[in-house]
Amino acid sequence: MRRQLSFHESTKRSLKKKKIRKIEKPSLVSKTSRDKNASITDIHEEDIEAFSDEENKIVHLNNLKEDRFQLWFEKYIPQKAADLAVHKSKISAIKQWMLTDSLESRLLLICGPSGCGKSTAVQVLAKELGYSLIEWLNPMNLKEPSNQESDTLSLTEKFSRFMSLCETYPELELMDSNNIQKRGKNAQGKKKFIFLDEIPHLSKFNGSLDAFRNVIRTALTSRGAFSIIMVLTEIQLNNLEGINSQDRNSFNSVQIMGNDLLQDPRVTVLQFNPIAPTYMKKCLGSILRKEGVPKSPKLLSLVENICSASEGDLRSAINSLQLSISQSFEKKGTKNIREVKEGKGKGNDFSLEAAQVLERLSKSDSEAYARFKNYKSAYIPKSDKNENSFFKKDVGLGMMHAIGKVVWNKREGDDEVLKASSQQTGNSERIKGVKVSKSQENKNCISLKSDQRERMLNVDQCFTSKRRSLVDIESTINQSGLSGSVFRYGLFENYVDSCVTTDEAFNVCDLLSISDCLSHDFPYSYTGDEISTWFSVQGTLFYLPSPVPRKWRQLRFQQWNNEGIVRGIFDDYMVIYGKRSVSDPVIEAHEDQVLEDIDDPIEDED
């Protein structure tokens, strides 16, 4: 017989049941059908799909936020050697050096201007070959408040320690079946290289430059496990500071490494050139296709102008293209922004964000936006021909380019004169396929210039016979990156090949001698040096023949490399006493040759 429960027992048992219900696990359901008391078996398949779709949307939005402000040159880094905008010979040279990796060549020095793909080529080839790079990065000098002595080493000392650790403590080296030591490989057989993409801040006055050279020299002589790949960006800045400006602003392989290291047989030097326009157009076109930008004649013109204005710097061209595309969203207005939001139009997140900010500023009476509009109207030309000059890279002409503009002496009407001369001499022979020797071409040029040589003897007739020059003297001198004395020395080495007669060579040589006498070494006068350089350039352009015989030749500047080496020995003495400009060329180029010091005017007074 079932015993009847008392009221106390029944209430106690009901409380236990309620407690058991409370500790049940809550179920995962969709937002529309949430119920805390539902069990796990109540979840439907539609709810699981909705939950996963919502999760994917959140991940996609996070990725968009990360890529919104990403620069294109970082977003579209080449992943294969075939995608590099570098000449195939340069790529094959780096690849062959990395595959060989012999003790006879311990250092690969890659030099070139900025944005020509030096570091990218090394990283892509290392990844493609399965090699790893031990990269040196300049550390930040940060000190903890609790420990002020935690970072007492200088940057040069840190670099020396890094190189010594790489050479002293390499990874485990294995032996193959023939007991031959595998050089430069780790325990997994993966080859490694020391990659110096950045170098410490160097100065010859505090000894850091000499310390850097000693570290590299020690690494070459040691029998370490890893070879070294160094990337050096060469810079030639405008000479606008007068004395010592060329020595302090220049940044090339000769001044950093030194002549003894560059001539070392264990050092391989590879010179990179600026990116060719064909490679640059191909790269920019690929980026535009990936970004979904539609083709148009205006876009093609924009790419052409950016390629011509970037001076072979691919990184600068990509940044200019990204900035130009972002400005196009501002001109199109709110319609494109709405289309991109609704998914009807194509566009990148960076351009969308920039257009939204500009739209918000344009609707408000903001002083910043007013200044922005005034800035655009003042500094961006409105003509179609120069509409992209705002993105032009501020670079110099370069040493050889500036000297070449002078010695080639281009004037108005040169093409017509050359065309008329080709019709008068040997043009019929070239049509038939008969080659003309260089001596015959020189004789033809001399015969064609006979009337000009007669006019050169009379100065009055010479003034009236010269056509207008196409060389801008001021921009050529300012963008050469050379001091006045070095620029005059470059003209002195290269003017002879442009002359046809001895009279022309005599006149140019006499004028360069007079211009050299106009400048003073002590006391140094920047105005006098500038006037002397103007006089030498203008006189050389005046006395050279027009047109200059068109033939292939290589410009020479033999003393430039030696100047950077020998000049460093006497920098301190020249700066203190002001005897001469540090940037003046030193004719005595041999290091073992003893140079006589200039007489001290203070000692002469005694």
From Swiss-Prot:
It holds the Pfam family Rad17. It is found in: Nucleus. GO terms for biological process: DNA damage checkpoint signaling; DNA repair; mitotic DNA replication checkpoint signaling; mitotic G2 DNA damage checkpoint signaling; mitotic intra-S DNA damage checkpoint signaling; telomere maintenance. GO terms for molecular function: ATP binding; ATP hydrolysis activity; chromatin binding; DNA clamp loader activity. InterPro entries: AAA+_ATPase (IPR003593), Checkpoint_prot_Rad17_Rad24 (IPR004582), P-loop_NTPase (IPR027417), Rad17/Rad24_fun/met (IPR018324). Keywords: ATP-binding, Cell cycle, DNA damage, Nucleotide-binding, Nucleus. NCBIfam families: rad24. Interacts with mug40. Participates in checkpoint pathways arrest of the cell cycle. A mechanism that allows the DNA repair pathways to act to restore the integrity of the DNA prior to DNA synthesis or separation of the replicated chromosomes. This is Checkpoint protein rad17. The gene is rad17.
